C-alpha cells in the first residue's frame, strides 16, 4: 500500500540486542540487504570496540589479503603501490574484521529479528565441531577506478571511487528462507540456506565437483602441445560461487559458479 509522505522507520539499529546472544548489542551493519516485501536479511556484528588500523583492538581479528594477479593491470598496480602494510609493496595486507558476525533476518509483520547463522563462538570449544559452524561471512576484493584511468564517454575518474579493499556479505531472502555465502573454518566456502529454525543446509560449496550442477557437459580443453582432451565436470571442483540479493524468488535460487581442476589446468 502506497502512503502519502511516508516516514522512514528504523527496523534494526546500532545498540539493539543481538538475538540469540546474551547481553550483546549490534555494533556494525553491512550494506548488502535483501528484501522480499516482508522479510529483510542483513549482515551484522557485535562486540567490537574502536578499530585501530594497525593492531585491530577488542573484538577484531586479523586477516591476510593478497593483491589480485588477474584482471585490470592498473588496479593490480594500485594495490601494490598502496601497500605500506608489513613489507611495503609486496602485495600482502593485514586488515581486521569483526570476530563476532552473523546473518540475520527482520520480519516487518512480527517486528522481530532472528539470527540465521553466526561465526564460531571462541569461548565454546564444542562449536568448532559443529558442521554448521562458520568462520566468516565477509568476502574481500580490491576494486575501484585508478587515478587518471578512464575518461571519454565514461567521464573522468574524479567522481568515481578510487581502488581499495572492500568487503561484502551476500544473502538473499525468500519468505522464511534465507540463502547466504559463508566461509567454513577449513577454508572452504559455499552457499547455504536456512528455513525458520531448521538446521542450516548446504546448497553448494567448494568441496563439490562440477557435476553436481551439470552432469552432461564435457569441456574440450587444449593442451600446450595443441592436442585436445575431453574433461567432464566431475573432474573439476567448484572454485567460486556468486549470489545476488534478488536471486531468491518463488522458491528458486539463482547462482553463478566457476570450476577448475586442482592444478588449475582446466576451468569452466
Role assignments for model-derived ranges:
Residues 1-268:
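Conserved "turn/edge" positions that cap or connect secondary-structure elements
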Amino acid at each position: 500500500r502506497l502512503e502519502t509522505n511516508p516516514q522512514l522507520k528504523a527496523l534494526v539499529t546500532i545498540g539493539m540486542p543481538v538475538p540469540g546472544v546474551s547481553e550483546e548489542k549490534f555494533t556494525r551493519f553491512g550494506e548488502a540487504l535483501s528484501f522480499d516485501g516482508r522479510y529483510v536479511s542483513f549482515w551484522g556484528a557485535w562486540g567490537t570496540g574502536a578499530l585501530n588500523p594497525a593492531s585491530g583492538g577488542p573484538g577484531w581479528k586479523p586477516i591476510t589479503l593478497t593483491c589480485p594477479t588477474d584482471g585490470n593491470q592498473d588496479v593490480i598496480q594500485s594495490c601494490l603501490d598502496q601497500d605500506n602494510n608489513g613489507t611495503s609493496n609486496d602485495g600482502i595486507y593485514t586488515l581486521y574484521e569483526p570476530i563476532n558476525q552473523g546473518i540475520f533476518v527482520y520480519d516487518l509483520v512480527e517486528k522481530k529479528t532472528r539470527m540465521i547463522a553466526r561465526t564460531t563462538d571462541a569461548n565454546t570449544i564444542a562449536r568448532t565441531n559443529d558442521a554448521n559452524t562458520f568462520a566468516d561471512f565477509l568476502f574481500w576484493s580490491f576494486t575501484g577506478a585508478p587515478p587518471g584511468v578512464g575518461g571519454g564517454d565514461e567521464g573522468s575518474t574524479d567522481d568515481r571511487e578510487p581502488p581499495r579493499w572492500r568487503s561484502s556479505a551476500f544473502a538473499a531472502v525468500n519468505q522464511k528462507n534465507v540463502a547466504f555465502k559463508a566461509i567454513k573454518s577449513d577454508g572452504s566456502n559455499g552457499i547455504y540456506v536456512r528455513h525458520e529454525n531448521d538446521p542450516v543446509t548446504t546448497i553448494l560449496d567448494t568441496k563439490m565437483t562440477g557435476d553436481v550442477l551439470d552432469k552432461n557437459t564435457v569441456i574440450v580443453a587444449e593442451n600446450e602441445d595443441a592436442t585436445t582432451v575431453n574433461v567432464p565436470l566431475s573432474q573439476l571442483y567448484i572454485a567460486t560461487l556468486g549470489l545476488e540479493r534478488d536471486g531468491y524468488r518463488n522458491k528458486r535460487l539463482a547462482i553463478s559458479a566457476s570450476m577448475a581442476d586442482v592444478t588449475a589446468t582446466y576451468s569452466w
